[in-house]
Every structure is written in structure tokens, then in C-alpha cells.
């Protein structure tokens, strides 16, 4: 079970003294909110059909008091350049100043692989003091050859990754087992 704690846009509003904090980040419409709902078997995280729905940093807590953070999506082209910049700045500020983060789950669309903006984001974060785990979503949309290609490209990064289907609820249990350990 997961419960909503608060939303914020600036550091003074962030959740204070979280326990065991994990964060989910990725491009708009990659499935961050849907993945959190699937992993925690809840519907507490608002999911929108339109990209760019999450514009705030949303803090949740599980039944053990662990903190789960749903960050806004980056790179949504239909937002103004100013709005895109504000969201990117908010994400970068959070990820560079937030010392409580234990793990960051970077979501990518497995159909697209690592896009230039995903690569830029990963390059920025790879020296961070927390573990980065790649979650390639929308596995159900891939054929066998495409699945092989995305696995091959992720293997080359030499980083822990999971290839999942949120809609079919496939390959999620291994990810659940890696959330807080």
C-alpha cells in the first residue's frame, strides 16, 4: 500500500527526513506513475493519458515508511521552452541536492531505447551518490528481435536494468524485489 504525502516544486517544500527514499524519473509518457501503481499494487498515483501530466515532485510513503518519489517527466515537446526548462531545473535541483536518495529508477521507452535526452540525463547522473537502475517500459510492444536489441544496448551500459510490461504486469516481481534492498 502506498499513501500520498505531499507535492512540491521547491526545496523548502520537500519531504523532511525521509526513510529509504527511491525516485522514479524519465521522459514524459514513459509510464512512471503507472509503474509506481503497478509495483505497489495501488492506484494512488494519478495517471494521465496526456504526456506532461505530472508537473510537481510527488512524495508517497509505503506501509514500512519508505519514501517513493514520482518526479515530473522531462522532454515534453508540447510544453513551452520556459515550462520545459522549469521542470528540468526542478528535477536537476532535486537530484543534485537531495542526499536522502538511495536509488533512482530511470525509465525509458523500450521501443525507442536510449534517446539523446535520456542519454544526456543518464550522463549527468552517473556520478551521483545513489544507485541508478534503468527500467525499460512497454516491453509488450516489442517483438523478439527488438527485445534482443534493447537488451544488447542496455548490457553495453553495464548498469542494472529491468525490461517490463506495465499493462500486462509482466516482469515486475524482480523489480519489486530490488526497490529497497
UniProtKB/Swiss-Prot annotation:
Residues 18-181 form the EngB-type G domain. GTP binds at residues 26-33, 52-56, 70-73, 137-140, 164-166. Transmembrane segments: none annotated. Its cofactor is Mg(2+). Mg(2+) binds at residues 33, 54. One of its GO terms (molecular function) is GTP binding. Keywords: Cell cycle, Cell division, GTP-binding, Magnesium, Metal-binding, Nucleotide-binding, Septation. Pfam families: MMR_HSR1. GO terms for biological process: division septum assembly. Belongs to the TRAFAC class TrmE-Era-EngA-EngB-Septin-like GTPase superfamily. EngB GTPase family. Necessary for normal cell division and for the maintenance of normal septation. HAMAP family: GTPase_EngB (MF_00321). PANTHER family: ENGB-TYPE G DOMAIN-CONTAINING PROTEIN (PTHR11649:SF13), MSS1/TRME-RELATED GTP-BINDING PROTEIN (PTHR11649). This is Probable GTP-binding protein EngB.
Amino acid at each position: 500500500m502506498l499513501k500520498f504525502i505531499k507535492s512540491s516544486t521547491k526545496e523548502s517544500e520537500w519531504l523532511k527526513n525521509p526513510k529509504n527514499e527511491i525516485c522514479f524519473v524519465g521522459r514524459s509518457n514513459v509510464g512512471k506513475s503507472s509503474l509506481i501503481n503497478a509495483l505497489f499494487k495501488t492506484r494512488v498515483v494519478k495517471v494521465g493519458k496526456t504526456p506532461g501530466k505530472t508537473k510537481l515532485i510527488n512524495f508517497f510513503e509505503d506501509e514500512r515508511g519508505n519514501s517513493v518519489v514520482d518526479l515530473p517527466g522531462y522532454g515534453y515537446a508540447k510544453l513551452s521552452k520556459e515550462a520545459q526548462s522549469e521542470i528540468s531545473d526542478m528535477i536537476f535541483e532535486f537530484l543534485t541536492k537531495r542526499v536522502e536518495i538511495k536509488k533512482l529508477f530511470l525509465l525509458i521507452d523500450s521501443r525507442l531505447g536510449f534517446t539523446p535526452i535520456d542519454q544526456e540525463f543518464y550522463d549527468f547522473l552517473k556520478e551521483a551518490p545513489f544507485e541508478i537502475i534503468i527500467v525499460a517500459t512497454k516491453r509488450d510492444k516489442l517483438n523478439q528481435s527488438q527485445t534482443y536489441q534493447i537488451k544488447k544496448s542496455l548490457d553495453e551500459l553495464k548498469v542494472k536494468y529491468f525490461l517490463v510490461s506495465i499493462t500486462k504486469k509482466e516482469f515486475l516481481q524482480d523489480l519489486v524485489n530490488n526497490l529497497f534492498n
